[in-house]
Amino acid sequence: KGSVPGMQEHEPPSPSAAASLELLPGDPSPVAPPLARRGPYGVGVTTLQITHADQPDPVGGGRYDRSLTLEIWYPSDRHGTTVHRDAFPPSPGTAARPFTFTGRGARDAPPLDGPWPVVLLAHGYPGSRVLMTHLAEPLASRGRLVIAADHPRSTHLDLGPFVDTLAHRPRDLLFLLRWLDAGLPGAPPALAALPDDGHRAVVGFSMGGYGALLAAGARLDPAARLEAVGVPVGWRGPLAPVLRGRHGPELDAARDRIGTIVALAPWGGRDAILLSSLAEVRARTLLLVGDADQISGYGDGVVPIFEHLGGAHRRLVTLRGMGHNIAPDPPPAAAWRSGDAGEYEHYADAVWNPRVANDLVRHFTVAFLEGDVAAAASSPAWPSAWSVPPSLRHALHVRTGQADATSPSLG
């Protein structure tokens, strides 16, 4: 069988392999493109809890408070490491199993004076606020304030019915945007002073990508067959806000703050999103996906999302042979030590080397967020940010779409 640069057939993980692993999430591979590398700043990281009070409960009816635990990365002059806590998700007959891993952020380090542009980072179902540390830390090191939430009832340790994530993921993101505009109530003053006043970027994986698109104006399809994905019959009542695309005046007012979306294997194009409603999305949008994605779908899932985003400047980057796991950190050492295939496969792809995939996700995300600044980056292998080198042309494909002439530009 011929070898493919950046791609590999994985053998089952060896329990002894973890002993030799020294790389941390976000450390670039030797073949990383230029924008995949860390930036000039050190990174601080802190944890904060906020509450979105009195929210509709699509599971039990009534109202409840949604407590969001936030991990916040920011530019600092400190360099250090910190221990993050996560868990492997539960499976039938097996409870979630906690583990720890190390990141290159200095815990509670003093921030560098801002203001800094803001990136919201949204995990999938299930996921966690530290699932994409490989992306959060380098973005902060390049001068961005990165905020990732544990979305209630959607995490490895707090996994609830899918209908709750369908209803609340866009609402959580709109709430975070409103919280930012309110001055980060509950945050330390030094942290509250960091966000700039520009448009926000939302980077979301799977259900995080779904949430970003719906927060920016898309709607749920009333003809969707959500029963096929485990949503109870009678879901249209509990999901009325995402069917209407209306969440109340305060949340809806935050929609215009979204200037850029990076959707990583976004879910819903095949199963849930009203494709015609994507014309309402005005945010610049980058879609990153594998053409072997069996969860979100490719030709019948993410490609239709790209084609219906007529109101937005957009790009579609396809990793050929990649499945759904385009966004997570590499499998943690705890998965190698346990030898549990399910724990390993929650993070890994069957074909792509996870560090090479991480490199490409970071590179294209930075290229899209930084625009002209990133376009100037070059190396012998990458003459420009969007020029795929010959060695990867069989593995990568890039499409570009322009907004309709009547659509406003958000820069």
State the predicted function of each range.
Residues 10, 15, 23-24, 30, ...:
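Alpha/beta-hydrolase-fold serine-hydrolase catalytic core, especially in secreted/extracellular enzymes
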Residues 15-119:
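Domain-level recognition of soluble alpha/beta enzyme cores
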Residues 107-116, 121, 125-158, 294-298:
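Short substrate-entry loop that stabilizes the transition state in hydrolases
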Residues 163-197, 224-233, 247:
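Alpha/beta-hydrolase active-site loop
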Residues 178-181, 209-221:
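Short glycine-enriched nucleophile-adjacent loop
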Residues 269-270, 292-296, 324-325:
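Acidic catalytic loop of the alpha/beta-hydrolase fold
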Residues 274, 297-307:
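Short alpha-helix in the alpha/beta-hydrolase fold that links the catalytic acid
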Residues 281, 287-289:
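Short beta-strand/loop motif that positions the catalytic acidic residue
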